[in-house]
Amino acid sequence: MNEQQRLASQQANASTKKEEKDYSKYFEHVYQPPSLKDAKKRGKEQVKIERDFGLPEEFRNFGKGRKFYIRTYGCQMNEHDTEVMAGIFTTLGYEPTFTTEDADVILLNTCAIRENAENKVFGELGHLKPLKQKNPDLLIGVCGCMSQEESVVNKIMQKHQHVDMVFGTHNIHRLPYILKDAMFSKATVVEVWSKEGDVIENLPKVRRGDIKAWVNIMYGCDKFCTYCIVPYTRGKERSRRPEDIIKEVRHLAANGYKEITLLGQNVNAYGKDFDDLEYGLGDLMDELRKIDIARIRFTTSHPRDFDDHLIEVLGKGGNLVEHIHLPVQSGSTDMLKIMARKYTREQYLELVRKIKKTIPNVVLTTDIIVGFPNETDEQFEETLSLYREVEFDSAFTFIYSPREGTPAAKMKDNIPMEVKKERLQRLNELVNEFSAKKNKKYEGQIVEVLVDGESKNNPDVLAGYTRTNKLVNFVAPKSVIGQLVKVKITEAKTWSLNGELVEEPIEVK
């Protein structure tokens, strides 16, 4: 234990019970709860790009001899944020651990998209309380999207006083300072920025594996769908400069990565916030496809921003894969209007027709919400009919979950839960039917598979994914992990494929 840690331990043990504190004043000055009116007024002039992340000398060996544990909930953006926080911890001298019992710092990187996700976090905080009682020096933190909600932070203050720090999505780069404050503070350290932070380049990362990598290309969302909390928790759209993205992808390719996924809450709005150049996702993809890396994906896209130039570029193929995740949410134009999706059923179908014409072998997947306020049986049937017409390969399906502060949360939630569950069951039956039918076509085909590693269910079986994001299980030597191989599909299941290795690793050119 170093001197800073020893002093922190003395202070923590001197008063294990945290002083009660009024946080309402804090929120009046720093945090504003979700406001559609205020959020739509936000400009882009405050966002700056910082390219030199560095740590002052005071943080050298700050975490030496200590371990960190991060549990991640939610989307790929949260997964990537966890990689950044792990990179910062490592730079501070901390070591990772895979058990909470062995950790000196525990962070829960949270998701606010649905109530169920929040309930899981509060449940986990309850489970961590005995650890804190056993070891008062343990630091417990809550970060991510839930932390951007005032009601959530107030609940943590009132019911989970063993939490040492709370910070949001805009100030991850300040983790060293937050850790230091938490180590020396008797009260919970709360640092939540209601306004977006700068775009910080060159943040350290500890990537999960060396085969696939996430690459953030933009942050935030300006679409303001009535049900969605993301524009409030993640802020306005801010795009990274193309030269920084291209540099990062080239670096990943040089280090042997085979696949990258470009990330953004609304990834195909990339570049719309630039005021000094006309440059969009299609232009970026056209540059990236020239880099020597096997596969490039992106997620998640909004139909409203899926333009013809992007479709044209994706049609060039090469390392641009034939899989597009295109959330529709509902097949009813009336429902889409209430959701503020800003497109109609026919406009979505026309977009699908354009994509299929340019990329005939494309695989489309989607997101769908059932039980949105005022959804009628007829409108739900329109969703089922759209699914059949598009012939999606799979879908993420959800029962509507009200999010405090969003316009939809003020609507009367007038669909009985039993009706919501019945609709979800019917939709999932259709999803399963089409997934099984689509996968059946792969039987007898030879496909390219990027091998991720051992199957989760059987260590003697390897698992990987096709260009169209199909899970393939097959028997092969462990030496092919991380490689591209040819596999003949012998059996199709609803959500996966079984096959046989027919060729040694493919050389990527």
From Swiss-Prot:
Cofactors needed by this protein, per the record, are:
[4Fe-4S] cluster
Region (Disordered) location: 1-22
Regions of biased composition (Polar residues) lie at 1-15
What catalytic activity is recorded? Answer: N(6)-dimethylallyladenosine(37) in tRNA + (sulfur carrier)-SH + AH2 + 2 S-adenosyl-L-methionine = 2-methylsulfanyl-N(6)-dimethylallyladenosine(37) in tRNA + (sulfur carrier)-H + 5'-deoxyadenosine + L-methionine + A + S-adenosyl-L-homocysteine + 2 H(+)
Enzyme Commission identifier(s): 2.8.4.3
Q: How is the cofactor bound?
A: Binds 2 [4Fe-4S] clusters. One cluster is coordinated with 3 cysteines and an exchangeable S-adenosyl-L-methionine.
User: Taking every annotated instance into account, which residue ranges of this chain make up the domain TRAM?
Assistant: 440-503
The record, for InterPro entries, names: Elp3/MiaA/NifB-like_rSAM, Methylthiotransferase, Methylthiotransferase_CS, Methylthiotransferase_N, Methylthiotransferase_N_sf, MiaB_methiolase, rSAM, rSAM_horseshoe
Q: Where mainly located?
A: cytoplasm
Lineage of origin: Bacteria, Bacillati, Bacillota, Bacilli, Bacillales
* A cellular-component GO term for this protein: cytosol
Q: Which top EC class is given?
A: transferase
Functional note:
Catalyzes the methylthiolation of N6-(dimethylallyl)adenosine (i(6)A), leading to the formation of 2-methylthio-N6-(dimethylallyl)adenosine (ms(2)i(6)A) at position 37 in tRNAs that read codons beginning with uridine.
What organism is this sequence from?
Bacillus cytotoxicus (strain DSM 22905 / CIP 110041 / 391-98 / NVH 391-98)
User: Subcellular location, in the record's words?
Assistant: Cytoplasm
This entry's Gene Ontology molecular function terms read: 4 iron, 4 sulfur cluster binding; metal ion binding; N6-isopentenyladenosine methylthiotransferase activity
What range(s) does the MTTase N-terminal domain occupy?
66-184
Detail which positions bind [4Fe-4S] cluster 2.
C221, C225, C228
Query: Is-annotated flag, keyword Zinc?
Result: no
Keywords, A to Z, come to: 4Fe-4S, Cytoplasm, Iron, Iron-sulfur, Metal-binding, S-adenosyl-L-methionine, Transferase, tRNA processing
What is the protein name stated in its UniProt record?
tRNA-2-methylthio-N(6)-dimethylallyladenosine synthase
Q: Describe, as the record does, how this protein assembles with itself and its partners.
A: Monomer.
Tell me its family. Belongs to the methylthiotransferase family. MiaB subfamily.
Instruction: Write out the residues that bind [4Fe-4S] cluster 1.
Output: C75, C111, C145
What the entry lists under SMART domains is as follows: Elp3
Q: Which residues form the Radical SAM core domain?
A: 207-437
